[in-house]
Amino acid sequence: MAEVESFSLDHTKVKAPYVRLAGRKALAGGVVEKYDLRLAQPNREALPTGALHTLEHLLAGYLRDHLPGVIDLSPMGCRTGFYLVVEGPVGEEKVLEAFAQALKDVLAHEGEVPGASFRECGNYRDHDLPGAKAWAEKVLKAGLRVQATVPLEAR
């Protein structure tokens, strides 16, 4: 099986919430960067699916408002955060600032969750705006920071 970057991260030595550069790839005419936007401490807590799903919908738009070149935002299967893919180079500090602002936008969001209707969403019943706001508030209160990659030690 091919190597997967996140499987070589020592999840016991990182401290959420954080922003971490998880990968950078040069392509013809540019660079693509992947960022680990971690909200919950690995193996200690996880976001409920409704809150995670709603954060995905809201952050997909709000991050684009604050950070040019966003390609994709995807939730992690472990439900502790998101992967953000951007045209780079951007840098962790810029991503951190945009992420913090987008979380503030989530807190201020009123009304319907964008893209959450039967026709727009593959699981439209699984949304939780109050839960999404609670996680945004928790992360902002804890304070985001840049996290260095901590590789697993040789076994």
UniProtKB/Swiss-Prot annotation:
Swiss-Prot/TrEMBL catalytic activity: S-(5-deoxy-D-ribos-5-yl)-L-homocysteine = (S)-4,5-dihydroxypentane-2,3-dione + L-homocysteine
Keywords, ordered alphabetically: Autoinducer synthesis, Iron, Lyase, Metal-binding, Quorum sensing
Record InterPro entries: LuxS_sf, Metalloenz_LuxS/M16, S-ribosylhomocysteinase
Keyword Zinc-finger on entry: no
Biological processes annotated in GO: quorum sensing
Note on how the cofactor is bound: Binds 1 Fe cation per subunit.
Sequence positions that bind Fe cation: 53, 57, 121
Pfam families reported in the protein's UniProt record: LuxS
EC number: 4.4.1.21
Cofactor list: Fe cation
Molecular functions per Gene Ontology: iron ion binding; S-ribosylhomocysteine lyase activity
Key word Disulfide bond present: no
Coiled coil regions in record: none
Protein family membership: Belongs to the LuxS family.
UniProt function note: Involved in the synthesis of autoinducer 2 (AI-2) which is secreted by bacteria and is used to communicate both the cell density and the metabolic potential of the environment. The regulation of gene expression in response to changes in cell density is called quorum sensing. Catalyzes the transformation of S-ribosylhomocysteine (RHC) to homocysteine (HC) and 4,5-dihydroxy-2,3-pentadione (DPD).
Complex formation: Homodimer.
Alphabetical list of HAMAP family matching this protein: LuxS (MF_00091)
Name under which the protein is recorded: S-ribosylhomocysteine lyase
Organism: Thermus thermophilus (strain ATCC 27634 / DSM 579 / HB8)
GN (gene name): luxS
